[in-house]
Each structure stands twice: as C-alpha cells, then as structure tokens.
C-alpha cells in the first residue's frame, strides 16, 4: 500500500526544499542573494497556487525555508503540493531564462530535472 498523504507530502517538501536550496546555492553565486531573493518572491506571487502553499515559503538573503509549508500541508493533496512547488521551480527557470539568457539554467538543469522526475514518480505511485 502507498504512503499516507501526510508522509508523502513531507517527502515531497523535503525533495523540493533540497532542490530549491541547490538552486539557491548555485544561482546566488552567479547573481547574488538579494537579486535571487527578489526573483523568487516575484515568482511566488506569479505562480498559480490554489492550495496557498507557496504563501508559506520564506525567502531572505540567507536562503529559502519551507518549514511553514511542512506544517500547513499535512491535509493537502499530494498532487496540489507537487503542482504548486513544481510550478514555482518551472516559473523560476522562466525568470532565469529572461533575465540571465539561460546562464543559470545551463548550470542547474542537470541537477533539477532528475529531482522533478523523482517528484512526479512519488505522486504517481
């Protein structure tokens, strides 16, 4: 039998938290923490999120925290959690495409794609 919804949500959040922190580490080296924080906050506001999960993400010059998301999403649908966080990552890459002419995307694509696929598999089980 599959995992309980709350456990699956926590696993998804852990995966996306690690992914977003990897993105943070590399992208902040290239464009700086302040500009990256601005891009992420802008992306959060522009990403559709019917479950309101993205509103709980905390962004500062120190990085990204999904701790409040962990607390809020216990009863959320794993599909909603995945869609919201996947949408954030995809839209952030769109911002990087426009603002850095794919420089950041080229650096991160090989790390991000396998994790997005892993998240898809987790939700589809």
In which residue ranges do the predicted regions lie?
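Long, compositionally biased intrinsically disordered regulatory segments in eukaryotic proteins
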Residues: 1-125
């Amino acid at each position: 039998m599959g995992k309980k919804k709350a456990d699956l949500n926590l696993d998804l959040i852990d995966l996306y938290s690690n992914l977003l922190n990897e993105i943070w580490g590399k992208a902040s080296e290239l464009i700086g923490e302040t500009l990256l924080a601005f891009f992420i906050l802008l992306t959060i506001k522009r990403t559709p999120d019917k479950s309101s999960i993205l509103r709980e993400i905390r962004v500062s010059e120190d990085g990204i925290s999904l701790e409040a998301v962990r607390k809020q999403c216990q009863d959320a649908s794993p599909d909603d959690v995945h869609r919201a966080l996947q949408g954030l990552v995809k839209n952030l890459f769109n911002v990087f495409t426009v603002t850095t002419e794919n420089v950041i995307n080229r650096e991160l694509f090989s790390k991000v794609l396998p994790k997005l696929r892993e998240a898809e598999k987790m939700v589809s089980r």
